[in-house]
Amino acid sequence: MKQNSLNVKQKKLSKIAFSHVGCEKNLVDTEHMQGLLHKEGYEVDSNINDANVVVVNTCSFIETAREESIRKILEYTNQGKEVIVAGCMAQHFKDELIKEIPEIKGLVGTGDYQKIAKVLDRVEKGEIVNEVSKIPEFIADEEMPRFVDKNKFVAYLRIAEGCNYNCAFCIIPKLRGPQRSRTIESILSEAKSLAKKGIQEIILISQITTNYGQDIYGKPSLAKLLNELSKVPIPWIRIHYAYPTGLTDEVIRAFKDSKNIVPYFDLPLQHSHPDVLKSMNRPWQASLNESILEKIREEIPSAVLRTSLIVGFPGEKKEHFEHLLQFLDRHKFDHVGVFIFSPEEGTAAFHLPNKVSPEVAEARKDNVISVQQNISREKNQIYVGSKMKIMVEQISDNNELIGRSYNFAPEIDGTVILSVKEKIDLKNYIGKFVEANISFADEYDLYGETIKIL
């Protein structure tokens, strides 16, 4: 790992490790906390077994994420580690966590991770710390130390934090606070710094990326940001969490005009039927779904479309679900993530009537997966026989290269698996782009052979 700042203070006694649960926004928080602690003289270790303090950065988006977070907390407290709980569960259950698990030494809210060093100092003095602001307001800028994993060539770049929407199923606005954007200058500065560190791909993230700048510039400013970022020498710039309302002509033009902004559209649409979307408190979306998808395909034929969907939402009838399946068949997304509705206390959907049974919801999820697998297989077959630009990220146990083309985002999509004829050290390929012949495809991955390093 590398850190942004070299101004490291005198070494402290505690050895700190981090355990991360949840999304990439949480990951960025973790990287900042690691950087801050290193700057203050703490030894930050990736090996939890060697650490005496573990910071568990938690997720509270859905029940399964909370269960995983609690499992990790209990695992480390049972090992005798001093545990500090950070992130969304600390924000969500700031009064309950320490009562239920008294072994926890401290809590750090989603708007308070910049205080992690002071929290740890207080914990080392024997204090039980509850550092959770009622309303998160902080967002890190390019000046805050951050660890960037030297073994990876992808970095997430947060352009805003928080959300002003109130989707009926979502607890995030209560956990992350209102939207607050960074300035274009701040984002550009960090992007340039990441480029100097050898990062080959940056992924722009926020709760709603297409709403970027509304709070500080008086209007959404993603198009202007993209135009500026396109000048930064990073081969791939990807955008996650784009909403249909924000995909204006200017934003789509920025995708078209920029060589390094990949035509990959991550659109968390959640559903297709107007009745379900209205219940989700997203009534504006139904009329836009069809038109924006058609517009993207028309303007950018090479566009890759990903969406995420919720099935089993209260009141979702059979005809609503059939509408969703027809929607998938009609628009043929490249990638789809599907989740069963999770009732979250504190959200409007928690009290909605007409609950869908778990058995029906599970069957609907399986149905969506089956339909999408067939679509994805057909989409991937298009690449067979073509040459593609691949970023190589690792070596498999079978001595093959594993990487991605622009149409695959890390972690959530497939990979490209390549054989190599040349008798050279495979490590020479890591972090580089290669040209490859694609010879086979399944519903998730592409397979082929390297031609040359680009």
UniProtKB/Swiss-Prot annotation:
SUPFAM superfamilies: Radical SAM enzymes
GO BP of this protein: tRNA modification
Pfam families noted in UniProt: Radical_SAM (PF04055), TRAM_2 (PF18693), UPF0004 (PF00919)
Keywords from the UniProt entry: 4Fe-4S, Cytoplasm, Iron, Iron-sulfur, Metal-binding, S-adenosyl-L-methionine, Transferase
Needed co-factor(s): [4Fe-4S] cluster
Domain TRAM: 381-452
Catalysed conversion reaction: L-aspartate(89)-[ribosomal protein uS12]-hydrogen + (sulfur carrier)-SH + AH2 + 2 S-adenosyl-L-methionine = 3-methylsulfanyl-L-aspartate(89)-[ribosomal protein uS12]-hydrogen + (sulfur carrier)-H + 5'-deoxyadenosine + L-methionine + A + S-adenosyl-L-homocysteine + 2 H(+)
UniProt-annotated binding residues for [4Fe-4S] cluster 1: C23, C59, C88
Positions bound to [4Fe-4S] cluster 2: C163, C167, C170
Compartments where found: Cytoplasm
Transmembrane segments: none
Domain MTTase N-terminal: 14-125
Domain Radical SAM core: 149-378
Lineage top rank: taxon: Bacteria
One GO MF term attached to the UniProt entry: aspartic acid methylthiotransferase activity
Cofactor: how bound: Binds 2 [4Fe-4S] clusters. One cluster is coordinated with 3 cysteines and an exchangeable S-adenosyl-L-methionine.
Any Gene Ontology CC annotation: cytosol
Described function: Catalyzes the methylthiolation of an aspartic acid residue of ribosomal protein uS12.
Family in the record: Belongs to the methylthiotransferase family. RimO subfamily.
Protein name per its UniProtKB record: Ribosomal protein uS12 methylthiotransferase RimO
Organism listed in the record: Prochlorococcus marinus (strain MIT 9301)
Gene it is expressed from: rimO
